[in-house]
């Protein structure tokens, strides 16, 4: 009996399952439920131990339906690595109960669905805009909202907590000093704004605001053919851009039902692990600099620069690379490139060890990071943490092990796990992950498979230039694919990879056309940063700055 059938039997005694629809779509288990049952179902699934993680909540708009909106919950079980998608239909002007009693991390995801679609989550304690500004009119991810519509923000907001002019709610307390940090402040590591009330150097309470770098990536995806979305993914986590390319292409390929060649898989693994290394160099280097260790910053960025040199040799670009294509890679690696990678990772291993010895035993560094702003494993799961932040809390979850892809299950590497969930453990985990990435790269580079770097499906991949200019079949193939685009079958999929900051997920809906009907990104930073006010409450201001750095927040993926 499969997982879905077991779940059906379990739910039979608790719910009227004759109103539920159980399906299996592109490898995903799906339950469609009446909106009235969704909150209770989610609470039951968590409390019964079926699904401990809420990875994503999003909306989808179907204007021709009587109930035009889907509310989609993507759940994960860390014990058996199973996933479940729960869907409920909500009509215009209707509401659905909040999922916060079941999963604390639903907070910002529901606010985003409210902001983008106007879906009302009844019982949400703070249902307001999160990505668009306070003067924005409408809901941009509705199908009737024009993608070319531009709305300028001309009035600034004062420092307050409710974030909506004229709305009731918390007000500033005269006993405490109001302090605004960001969104243009070097300590914020991006366009992040923190509004705090201070009692001396202690944070009494704070609120955080995002959206300053929002450009509606998901709306742009709906207006572009599948392959043309790839450059936009570069701008998500721009510190490890190839990982975004890989995650997006992997989701589309799964919907298409194609498997890329072994050589393309190997190249993607190498690029992903190099990207993980440079992402961690930024997190460690800038974080240490915030604590006064300036040497670390220059040391780490020296390693990063050498990796960029390899990217440049492979594709001509450094930061935003667009190296992958749906079906494989954009081009093969140049001769000798894998040998250069092997030579560089030896340097990186040596440099990582030297840097770790310089930092992790440093008395000042230990005092500033150990037992500072810790997060428990239970709280991390409730918030939806993934990646190094989750593993620092003692939870051994890594998709490369839990749901292996591209041959990770055949590679020998370890998953570093912390114990205290404090700032110190977050750095220890990232240092060790750099070493493990080096191990992975060495194994793959020494055994790169032969064969092609892409599939040769004429309905998916453009022909090579020599074929376009050399024969009529290649020319016509190129013409038809450009004009009509690749067209995945009607369906939907949620696919995820282990990016540098955690689970990078793509919920993709196809209506059979050349553009995605709906593309939702699950950015790892989003779930993490929503917990910031809780994590730093009662801490010193300097510790809050160190916490921001240890979270490695990237505004590009946070705001999209």
Swiss-Prot record:
It is found in: Cytoplasm; Cell inner membrane. One of its GO terms (molecular function) is quinone binding. InterPro entries: NADH_DH_suC, NADH_Q_OxRdtase_suD, NADH_quin_OxRdtase_su_C/D-like, NADH_UbQ_OxRdtase_30kDa_su, NADH_UbQ_OxRdtase_CS, NDH-1_subunit_CD, NDH1_su_D/H, NiFe-Hase_large. It catalyses: a quinone + NADH + 5 H(+)(in) = a quinol + NAD(+) + 4 H(+)(out). The keyword Cytoplasm applies. SUPFAM superfamilies: HydB/Nqo4-like (SSF56762), Nqo5-like (SSF143243). Residues 175-560 are annotated as: NADH dehydrogenase I subunit D. Pfam families: Complex1_30kDa, Complex1_49kDa. Residues 2-157 are annotated as: NADH dehydrogenase I subunit C. It is a peripheral membrane protein. The keyword Mitochondrion does not apply. In the N-terminal section; belongs to the complex I 30 kDa subunit family. This is NADH-quinone oxidoreductase subunit C/D.
């Amino acid at each position: 009996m499969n997982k879905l059938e077991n779940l059906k039997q379990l739910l039979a005694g608790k719910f009227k399952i004759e109103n539920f629809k159980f399906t299996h779509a592109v490898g995903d288990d799906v339950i469609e439920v009446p909106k009235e049952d969704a909150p209770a179902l989610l609470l039951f699934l968590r409390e019964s131990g079926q699904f401990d993680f809420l990875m994503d909540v999003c909306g989808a708009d179907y204007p021709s339906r009587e109930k035009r909106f889907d509310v989609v919950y993507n759940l994960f079980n860390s014990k058996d690595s199973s996933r479940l998608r729960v869907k409920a239909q909500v009509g215009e002007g209707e509401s659905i109960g909040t999922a916060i009693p079941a999963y604390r991390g639903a907070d910002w995801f529901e606010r985003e669905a409210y902001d983008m679609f106007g879906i009302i989550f009844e019982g949400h304690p703070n249902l307001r805009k999160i990505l668009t500004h306070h003067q924005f009119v409408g809901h941009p991810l509705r199908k009737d909202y024009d993608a070319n519509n531009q709305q300028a923000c001309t009035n600034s907001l004062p420092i307050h907590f409710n974030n909506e002019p004229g709305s009731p709610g918390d007000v500033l307390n005269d006993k405490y000093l109001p302090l605004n940090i960001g969104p243009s402040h070097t300590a914020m590591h991006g366009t992040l704004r923190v509004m705090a009330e201070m009692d001396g150097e202690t944070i009494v309470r704070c609120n955080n605001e995002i959206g300053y770098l929002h450009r509606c990536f998901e709306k742009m995806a709906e207006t572009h053919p599948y392959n043309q979305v790839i450059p936009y993914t570069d701008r998500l986590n721009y510190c490890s851009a190839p990982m975004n390319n890989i995650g997006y292409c992997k989701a589309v390929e799964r919907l298409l039902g194609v498997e890329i060649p072994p050589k393309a898989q190997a190249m993607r693994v190498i690029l992903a692990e190099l990207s993980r290394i440079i992402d961690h160099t930024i997190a460690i280097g800038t974080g240490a600099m915030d604590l006064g260790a300036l040497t670390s910053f220059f040391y780490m960025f020296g390693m990063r620069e050498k990796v960029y040199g390899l990217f440049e040799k492979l594709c001509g670009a450094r930061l935003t690379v667009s190296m992958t294509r749906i079906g494989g890679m954009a081009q093969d690696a140049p001769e000798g490139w894998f040998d250069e990678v092997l030579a560089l990772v030896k340097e990186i291993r040596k440099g990582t060890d030297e840097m770790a010895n310089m930092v992790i035993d440093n008395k000042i560094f230990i005092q500033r990071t150990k037992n500072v702003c810790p997060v428990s494993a239970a709280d991390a799961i409730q918030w939806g943490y993934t990646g190094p932040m989750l593993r620092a809390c003692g939870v051994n979850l890594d998709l490369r092990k839990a749901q292996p892809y591209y041959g990770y299950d055949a590679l020998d590497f370890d998953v570093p796990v912390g114990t205290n969930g404090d700032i110190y453990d977050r750095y220890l985990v990232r240092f060790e992950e750099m070493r493990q990435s080096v191990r992975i790269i060495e194994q793959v580079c020494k055994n790169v498979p032969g064969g092609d770097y892409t599939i040769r499906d004429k309905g998916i991949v453009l022909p090579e230039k020599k074929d376009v200019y050399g024969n009529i079949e290649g020319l016509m193939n190129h013409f038809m694919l450009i004009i009509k685009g690749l067209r995945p079958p009607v369906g939907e999929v949620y696919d995820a990879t282990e990016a540098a900051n955690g689970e990078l997920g793509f919920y993709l809906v196809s209506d059979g056309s050349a553009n995605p009907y709906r593309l939702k990104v699950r950015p790892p930073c989003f779930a993490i940063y929503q917990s910031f006010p809780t994590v730093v409450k009662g801490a010193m201001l300097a510790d809050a700055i160190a916490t921001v750095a240890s979270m490695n927040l990237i505004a590009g993926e946070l705001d999209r």
